Amino acid sequence: MTKEKTLPLPRSECICPICQEILLEPVTLPCKHTLCNPCFQMTVEKASLCCPFCRKRVSTWARLHSRTRTLVNTELWERIQKQYPKECQRRASGQESDDLADELASCPAPLLCQPGEIRQEYEAEVSKIEAERLAQEEAERKASEDYIQKLLAEEAAQDRLHSEAVQREMEEQLKIDEELARTLSVDLDVSNASCSSVSSVTSKKVVVSKSSKNVKNKQRVSGDIERFLTPRAVAVVGIDESMNSDSSECFIVFDEGEDEMPELSPQCPSTSLIQERGVELIMPYLSDCYKVESNTTSQQDRCSERSQVCNGTYSSCSDSIDMEESMAIKKQSTTAGLFPERGYHSPENGMESNTMNCSTPKHLGMTGTLKRKCEDCSIDLEEKAGSCRNVKKKKLSLTEDCPVPSVHAGKLIELEENLYERRRQEEQDRLLALQLQRELDKELKQVNRGKGSPDEYELRTKRGLKLQECLKLQECQDSPLPLRKEIPVQDNSRNTQSEYSPDENKKPSRKNSVRSARVRQSRAVANTEGSSDGINVLKPINKQPTILDLFQRSAGK
């Protein structure tokens, strides 16, 4: 700062840009433009409070410094006075400096632009700006295309991954299904092979004494095949085995020829007994239960039967009798729950059957009883088969006599009846509402023309009023003449009203004309029959009396 202050000011910085003379009391504006005080007073304060070079508003700054009298840059003014004292003195005295005039004269002449030069510069600038704009738009378009391509590629990749995952899952599922089908087919082949081998071995050893036993064996073999094909038929066989008292359960036929090997007979009832019982097995639950039971325990039961028959380890038939009783109770509960119309119930075991049906699952109970039946068969069953059949006949005869209504089925029937009744009542209410709405619409469409209604007919005046008027006229005619003064005037007024009605095209009715003619005739007759006094009275009052009238009045007096 000190070096700048010590350096001499160039002459160009000491000249006012407005008056082109030495600065006199220079004023430095906030925008760093400097001009002399007289020029500041003339241009800024009087014209506008803005800088004459950059148009910056300096009103606040000018008011503040004029109030404090600090408009003049004293430091610059002192330096100018030190460097150029003569010019400052000459300027203060009002004389023009010759040096400045010489400098102005020595300035080079201004150069003018060539024709079309400015237009060319303008067009060049416009083309430059347009090129920049096009380049920017092209860059934006390219960026948007790249982004769209990127999004499409990502979406295609996601779709491809999803399709691959779905295809992989389908292939895995197909593999699992193939393995399951293969295992099922192998199990089915093994079971069929074992059944065929067992049947071939037993056919040599078993000697059937009766033709009914051959029929039962054939039905048993067919039942083994139907166990895999028709679950409903298997369910019929499985349930009737526990309920049919006449089926020969667990009795043994000995082969007299070959080492007396025992063999279990098939547990299949005849079709005639099924028809006699009338058990209708149309519910899918029993067939499903027995299908699961047959699939899980068929081979184990056959193996256990063979081992027990070969070893000869059979227990007594007392346990089988108890199990048959429990099986009958369970079957009563199942048939009572599923078929309420054909329920089987014994009076002493009714509560037990209901509790057993609620507490234990049906298919588990059936599987347990079938296993124990096969395990508890003994060699001496021929002697005790009759007692077993008698016990079962007694139990089933008691159950057939006493049907039990199912509580659940009764509730369902009652609920269905309530719903049907409610539906019927709602339909009746709907029909009644429609009928009432139709009647209401019909009443609204009808027009009431009765008396007192807004749409009543505008009737003519009654004939009774006209008759009363005629009677009044007759009474007036019969009355003395002074009372009959005003009557003709009223009739005339009424006639004039009828004649001068507002409707000019309206014609008088024929009856009124006839009636008016009769009234006039009667009045004329009355006037002729009356005395001269009556004639005088009927004359108009405002008429000027004649001499004859005066003589008549005097004669009358």
Curated annotation (Swiss-Prot):
Pathway: Protein modification; protein ubiquitination. Residues 508-521 have a biased composition (Basic residues). A motif (MIU motif 1) lies at residues 170-193. A motif (UMI motif) lies at residues 145-153. One of its GO terms (cellular component) is ubiquitin ligase complex. Keywords: Chromatin regulator, DNA damage, DNA repair, Metal-binding, Nucleus, Transferase, Ubl conjugation pathway, Zinc, Zinc-finger. A motif (LR motif 2) lies at residues 449-460. Transmembrane segments: none annotated. GO terms for biological process: DNA damage response; DNA repair-dependent chromatin remodeling; double-strand break repair; isotype switching; negative regulation of transcription elongation by RNA polymerase II; positive regulation of DNA repair; protein K63-linked ubiquitination; protein ubiquitination. It catalyses: S-ubiquitinyl-[E2 ubiquitin-conjugating enzyme]-L-cysteine + [acceptor protein]-L-lysine = [E2 ubiquitin-conjugating enzyme]-L-cysteine + N(6)-ubiquitinyl-[acceptor protein]-L-lysine. Residues 482-543 are annotated as: Disordered. Its EC number is 2.3.2.27. Pfam families: zf-C3HC4 (PF00097). The MIU motif (motif interacting with ubiquitin) mediates the interaction with both 'Lys-48'- and 'Lys-63'-linked ubiquitin chains. The UMI motif mediates interaction with ubiquitin with a preference for 'Lys-63'-linked ubiquitin. The specificity for different types of ubiquitin is mediated by juxtaposition of ubiquitin-binding motifs (MIU and UMI motifs) with LR motifs (LRMs). Monomer. This is E3 ubiquitin-protein ligase rnf168. It comes from Xenopus laevis.
